[in-house]
A protein has these predicted regions:
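Short amphipathic alpha-helical coupling segments at ligand-binding clamshell hinges
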Residues: 144-148
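Short beta-strand-to-turn element immediately C-terminal to the catalytic PLP-Schiff-base lysine
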Residues: 19-21
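Intrinsically disordered, low-complexity polar regions and short flexible loop motifs
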Residues: 130
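Ligand-binding/active-site lining segments
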Residues: 12
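Bilobed periplasmic-binding protein-like "clamshell/Venus-flytrap" ligand-binding domains
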Residues: 76, 149, 154-166
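C-terminal cap/loop subdomain of S1 sulfatases and analogous C-terminal strand-loop tails that border
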Residues: 3-9, 26-35, 40-127, 158-159
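Catalytic cores of eukaryotic secretory-pathway lumenal/extracellular enzymes that build
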Residues: 15-16
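Active-site-proximal N-terminal segment of extracellular/periplasmic enzymes that hydrolyze or transfer
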Residues: 135-143
Length: 168
């Protein structure tokens, strides 16, 4: 089974099935385990499948994967996916230490890096060869780890919750 549980950024914590039924358009029983889709992809994809144009000035982060849903191609992401799993003293750690991930992750092509916001506990996995995330190869690719760590840590710094802003 996949490593991780809910409350972790390993695949067992972030992957979920996506089941689509569209008679006469999508062949029943088809399974695609290689394409990486995310919630941000739903809007442009479902609009395309339904024949609806997105707004003229739409600038969402999602990609259109209509061809994947219709079984016409596999998908390669054009952009990286990034996750932050916030934690505090009351919430956020799976019971099994093996399933406790760093709080940031980035998926870039076949690579997945997990790391903490301070750069500690970097874990790199080749998702084409190691979908169960058993072989941390961060030590074999220090330049890639540095590049992806910088990218996800900068993303986190720009997007993290600043807390409630009030004049009171």
């Amino acid at each position: 089974y996949l490593r991780g549980t809910k409350n972790s950024l390993y695949e067992g914590g972030i992957r979920m099935p996506f089941i689509v039924k569209y008679p006469k358009k999508i062949k029943p029983g088809r399974v695609n385990n290689s394409s990486v889709l995310c919630a941000v992809d739903l809007y442009p994809t479902l609009c395309s499948v339904a024949g609806i144009k997105t707004e003229k000035n739409y600038k969402g982060d999602g990609q259109n994967y209509a061809k994947v849903l219709l079984g016409k191609s596999e998908a390669k992401r054009k952009t990286d996916l990034m996750w932050d799993f916030g934690r505090n003293k009351h919430f956020g750690f799976p019971g099994n230490p093996y399933d406790r991930s760093p709080h940031l992750a980035i998926r870039s092509g076949k690579w997945k890096l997990l790391v903490n916001g301070d750069g500690s506990d970097a874990q790199l996995y080749d998702m084409e060869l190691d979908k169960f995330e058993k072989n941390n190869i961060a030590g074999e690719h220090p330049e890639l780890v540095a590049k992806l760590s910088k990218k996800v840590c900068e993303w986190y710094a720009q997007n993290k919750d600043k807390g409630l802003q009030t004049d009171l």
